[in-house]
């Protein structure tokens, strides 16, 4: 018998999150939670949803992988000519969501977006597996193609061209940094009375922490 979707639910009971426990620096708090997600052996603990805005104001979301973070912001890499790349070029704002279900935790981040330096993009690109570097040249991301054979033929042609030699970074491929103005830490609690601590940046001053109603 198929289970009713309406009946799918879980009561969150693992732990709580208080203002006294939370680090006053949201990046330190994020690192703490991220390290705990690593220890919990999630398949991809750095997977995150990124939401952007289309030219006509419609939301657009997809999963990407976090590749670095520090107090400047949260970094991911992509094709600058992709749909999200073009959307960020026009409207440089984004929202990120991390969901670590086994820990009953969610992190939401909102902020402005900028490209990382060419040096940062070069360094990360050079660290990727050889065929992944070729893949950055193969894919005209978000464009319509006739079949998968188009990709496979392009990949083989590039393998023949480079033959395990160094592959340069495409000029249309690199990193974005989301520079947060708001970071919310959500911890599931019993009876849907979850803990929500929201860090907000007061321009030129400091981070403040506010508790939000669930």
UniProtKB/Swiss-Prot annotation:
Record-stated family: Belongs to the pyridoxamine 5'-phosphate oxidase family.
Q: Which residues bind FMN?
A: 62-67, 77-78, 84, 106, 141-142, 186, 196
Q: What is this protein called?
A: Pyridoxine/pyridoxamine 5'-phosphate oxidase
Q: Which InterPro entries match?
A: Pyridox_Oxase, Pyridox_Oxase_CS, Pyridox_Oxase_N, Pyridoxamine_oxidase_dimer_C, Split_barrel_FMN-bd
Keyword list, A-Z: Flavoprotein, FMN, Oxidoreductase, Pyridoxine biosynthesis
Concerning PROSITE patterns, the annotation shows: PYRIDOX_OXIDASE
Q: How does it assemble?
A: Homodimer.
**Catalytic activity, reaction form:** pyridoxamine 5'-phosphate + O2 + H2O = pyridoxal 5'-phosphate + H2O2 + NH4(+); pyridoxine 5'-phosphate + O2 = pyridoxal 5'-phosphate + H2O2
EC numbers on record: 1.4.3.5
Superkingdom assignment? Bacteria
Function of the protein: Catalyzes the oxidation of either pyridoxine 5'-phosphate (PNP) or pyridoxamine 5'-phosphate (PMP) into pyridoxal 5'-phosphate (PLP).
User: Could you list the residue ranges forming a coiled coil in this record?
Assistant: none
The UniProt entry, under SUPFAM superfamilies, shows:
FMN-binding split barrel
Entry binding sites for substrate? 9-12, 67, 124, 128, 132, 192-194
Its source organism is Gloeothece citriformis (strain PCC 7424) (Cyanothece sp. (strain PCC 7424))
Classification via NCBIfam families: pdxH, PRK05679.1
Q: Which cofactor does it need?
A: FMN
Cofactor binding description: Binds 1 FMN per subunit.
- One GO term of the biological process aspect: pyridoxine biosynthetic process
What are the TM regions of this chain, as residue ranges?
A: none
**Where does this protein act, in terms of pathway?**
Cofactor metabolism; pyridoxal 5'-phosphate salvage; pyridoxal 5'-phosphate from pyridoxamine 5'-phosphate: step 1/1; Cofactor metabolism; pyridoxal 5'-phosphate salvage; pyridoxal 5'-phosphate from pyridoxine 5'-phosphate: step 1/1
